[in-house]
A protein has these predicted regions:
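Acidic (Asp/Glu-rich) sequence patches and key acidic residues
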Residues: 1-137
Length: 137
C-alpha cells in the first residue's frame, strides 16, 4: 500500500508527496532513529518518528516543530554517507533517472526520484503557511 501525504487549501490539493510504500517511509524513520537518535526512536525527532502513519494527519499546530525537525535531519543526513537504495522500485527508478546519491539525505527518494525529506519539508512549510494539516492518504 502506498503512502501519499498532502496538504489541501480551500478544498484543492496544494502540495503532495508519494512516499512509496509504508515500508519505504518506515525505512527512512528507522534510519533516522538508528543513526541520528542513537537507537532511541523519538529521542531527538518525536514529531516525525513517533507519529503513527495510521493517525491520518499532522495537525497544523504540530507542523512548525515538524519543519524544524526535518531541517535538522536534512542537515545531519547531508553529512552522512550515501546508503544503497532497497531492491525493487527505488533501484529501478534510480537507474532510469541516473540517480547517484552523494549522501544519506539523497538516499531516500519519493516515487518521482526526488529526495523524500525535501518533499516532507515542503509539505510542512505549505501546511504552516496555509494553517492546514498534512494528510496521510
Amino acid at each position: 500500500m502506498s503512502l501519499y501525504l498532502c496538504v489541501f487549501v480551500s478544498g484543492v490539493e496544494s502540495y503532495g508527496v508519494d512516499a512509496g510504500a509504508y515500508s519505504d517511509f518506515n525505512r527512512l524513520r528507522h534510519y533516522i532513529a538508528q543513526h541520528l537518535e542513537d537507537g532511541k526512536p523519538g529521542f531527538r525527532f518525536p514529531n516525525l518518528i513517533l507519529h503513527s502513519d495510521c493517525e491520518g494527519e499532522w495537525r497544523p499546530e504540530d507542523c512548525a516543530a515538524l519543519r524544524d525537525e526535518l531541517a535538522r535531519i536534512i542537515e545531519a543526513m547531508c553529512e552522512r554517507p550515501a546508503t544503497d537504495f532497497p531492491p525493487g522500485w527505488q533501484v529501478a527508478l534510480a537507474q532510469s533517472l541516473h540517480l547517484a546519491p552523494r549522501n544519506a539525505m539523497e538516499s531516500f527518494i519519493d516515487v518521482d526520484g526526488e529526495p523524500l525529506l525535501v518533499g516532507l519539508l515542503g509539505l510542512a512549510e505549505t501546511a504552516i503557511q496555509a494553517g492546514e494539516p498534512i494528510l496521510f492518504q
